[in-house]
Amino acid sequence: DKEFSMPDNFYDDYEGRPAAAAQTMSIAKDMDIIYDTKMYREGMKSRLKKAYGRKIKRLTPEDRVAYDAVYDSITDVFFRENPQGKELVEWKYQRFMRDYAKVVKSLDDNVGRVLDYLEKAGLLDNTLVVYTSDQGFYMGEHGWFDKRFMYEESMRTPLVMCLPKGFQKRGDIPELVQNIDYAPTFLELAGVSVPSDIQGVSLLPLLKGESPADWRTS
């Protein structure tokens, strides 16, 4: 497994930021050893053990076999080495990042499958494919995981588009866009009138390579 570099502020002391210090998404304090890192042996206790059990029960028998094939060996090593203190905190970070990276890899593979299907079906030139999310996620910055604190890392969201034929724009778009812009974009692209009470702005000018002078800056 890959060894991930830790963010420079992983051991943030939150000096002068009492709200940040009081958050409940610390890798050290709040990352549940059973629920979040999936390390479980019979008889173990944790705050989220029951929630973990409910999730495991949702797996099909085939999925459970595949799940155990991955995590049984990792769990064996974890209990044999028995990390404590700072070593445990950094182990949790690595486990979290490795799981996250594998999820992202699976997403990437399956986005590729969708694009391959659209191309084979002759639909790719007439389809807008959008990959996005509802919020960002902490990847160890400030010693955090999860997303529930309004710092830069969780404010930003991914937005990647595969454009239909006729749109020449490629690469990064530097203008500030928001998720409220998606609905008017889709409506305009489909040739539907955008209701006056929609708050967002269509992204089509940006996707066409234009730079409107009155585009938002904040």
Regions flagged by a language model, labelled:
Residues 194, 198, 212-215:
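Glycine/proline-rich active-site loop of Rossmann-fold NAD(P)-dependent oxidoreductases
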Residues 1-176, 189-197:
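Active-site-proximal cap/lid insertion segments
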Residues 20, 205-209:
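Short, solvent-exposed polar/charged micro-motifs at secondary-structure junctions
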Residues 156, 178-189, 202, 206:
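Generic recognition of well-ordered alpha-helical segments
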Residues 1, 147, 210, 215-218:
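Catalytic-site neighborhoods of secreted/periplasmic enzymes
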Residues 157-158, 201, 217-218:
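Extracytoplasmic/periplasmic beta-strand context in beta-sandwich domains
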